[in-house]
Amino acid sequence: MFDAYGRNIHYLRLSVTDLCNLRCRYCMPDGVPKLAHEDILTYEEFLRLAALFAQCGIDTVRITGGEPLVRRGVEQLTAGLKAIPGIRRVALTTNGVLLAQKLPALLAAGLDSVNISLDTLHPETFRRITGKDELAAVQNGIRAALASGIPVKLNCVPQPGVNEGELESLAALAQEHPLQMRFIEMMPIGFGAGLPGLSGPELLERFYRRWPRLQPVTGAAFGDGPAVYYSAPGWRGSIGLIAAVHGKFCASCNRVRLTSQGFLRPCLASESGTDLRALLRSGADDAALLQAIQNTILAKPREHHFGQGSMPATRGMYRIGG
């Protein structure tokens, strides 16, 4: 389906929980309130809505959280999504802590690709960022994913004074392994709003100094998301830059987000949207739900306005689904 600005909206990010087993300082630090169990959509509700999204042209679904793997039954949800006519790809974004043990069942369910958060290679820094001592588990998850052959992307948020000294070491993972190592600008959303970041142009300059033969790369393997990818001769993978603040890519945005509470958000940086849970639970039929989805997509804003204030912490990434 095309929105009011001619963008083909075919990608749904599906947040299945607000819970997480880490406490990353820019996303979900200690002390944030949990949602009530009854406020979260059931898998049956997610699948009913996903089938309607498919009728609107959604062909790619990414399962997110919180941390999606802390919710029981994500494998069954994956299989259910894959069975919906029109859904071509189902992907997962995870912190990786539970990935090694969950991956076989996810692959059997038809999972197509996985994105794993990795902000550091050092245990002490990992504890500082996440509040937990789980780096080894994350690394095991990455190794398991690479060994399985499923496409792997790693996501890093550069943070001055925290992990900026090891960004080249993280980038070098793409030199050594067949993966995409992506660097995402800190966004002024929720708890990340008060934290400093490094811009995409700054990062690219650093990486060019280290690897002067880096060249932009494109193609189907790099998807149609916001990242701009680079590689060099002899590399097994690539690095990606997602410059959400300094390289606004709204003109090519192709996605909408459904929160775990059933709120359809057409833009990551906007408070606007539609409460599909209220419609679902008040007895709305499929025609009414489909119309609500279509109206929300048509109302997708032209662009974000990160420079004009931040979203409140109560609307943190862990609630939106990233």
Walk through the language-model features, giving the residues of each:
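Canonical Radical SAM [4Fe-4S] cluster-binding loop centered on the CxxxCxxC motif
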Residues: 4-44
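Conserved, mostly hydrophobic/aromatic
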Residues: 16, 20, 24, 63, ...
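Short, small-residue-enriched loops and turns at beta-alpha junctions
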Residues: 16, 35, 67-71, 159-162, ...
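Glycine-centered loop/turn positions within well-structured domains
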Residues: 22, 123-124, 248, 274
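Residues that scaffold the ATP/ADP-binding catalytic core of kinase and kinase-like folds
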Residues: 23, 27, 71, 124, ...
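A short acidic, helix-capping loop that chelates divalent metal ions and anchors anionic groups
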Residues: 32-36, 100, 122-129, 190-194, ...
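Radical SAM/AdoMet-radical enzyme domain recognition
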Residues: 40-63, 70-184
